[in-house]
Amino acid sequence: MIDKNDITGLILAGGRASRMGSVDKGLQNFHGMPLAMHTLLRLGPQVGDIMINANRNLAAYEAMGAPVWPDALPDFPGPLAGFAAGLERCETPYMVTAPCDTPNFPADMVSRLADALIAEGAQIAMAATTADGALRTQPVFCLMRIDLLDSLLEFLHSGQRKTEIWANQHRCAIVRFDDAQAFAGANTLAELRQLQS
């Protein structure tokens, strides 16, 4: 069993949000609060510590009460750059990630990922849902050991960017969640409106 105090949560808010007109997605209003604040309030009780990966509007994210770390790599290279920024600063043995645009992920997600990581002797545990009868991984919802930092940096410096390709280089437990809607994110303003309805 992994104690929640041994896990740091990382909110991924460093993307370009090109499908949302390049606005800062984590700062978009959702039921009266920024999307990223919903993620922080959902993730916070599941972990011992929390931080945010963002590349714009850093003061607005810092006002949410968590340390904010930008990508070390330029040009919005994707979630793995956020993973690296978090792993470089993580002071617990494990780190779990959640994107800023998915405010309804399960309240027991972290404990379920942690249980699977231990049960399967894995280095990474990744959430998955079923869509149209097929298992679909949710690669930005994953728990990892922090000793994977060197592997991740090597992967990024080779020019690779796909989370699943990197994760599959390690022992990865896939954890199925029944409610696919819990992992619904807002990639466009229309999807954000749909989430609010």
UniProtKB/Swiss-Prot annotation:
Its EC number is 2.7.7.77. GTP binds at residues 12-14, 25, 53, 71, 101. Its cofactor is Mg(2+). Its main location: cytoplasm. Pfam families: NTP_transf_3. CDD domains: MobA. The keyword Transferase applies. One of its GO terms (cellular component) is cytoplasm. Signal peptide: none annotated. InterPro entries: MobA-like_NTP_Trfase, Molybde_CF_guanTrfase, Nucleotide-diphossugar_trans. Mg(2+) binds at residue 101. It is found in: Cytoplasm. Keywords: Cytoplasm, GTP-binding, Magnesium, Metal-binding, Molybdenum cofactor biosynthesis, Nucleotide-binding, Transferase. The keyword Transcription regulation does not apply. The N-terminal domain determines nucleotide recognition and specific binding, while the C-terminal domain determines the specific binding to the target protein. HAMAP family: MobA (MF_00316). Monomer. Belongs to the MobA family. Transfers a GMP moiety from GTP to Mo-molybdopterin (Mo-MPT) cofactor (Moco or molybdenum cofactor) to form Mo-molybdopterin guanine dinucleotide (Mo-MGD) cofactor. This is Molybdenum cofactor guanylyltransferase. It comes from Bordetella pertussis (strain Tohama I / ATCC BAA-589 / NCTC 13251).
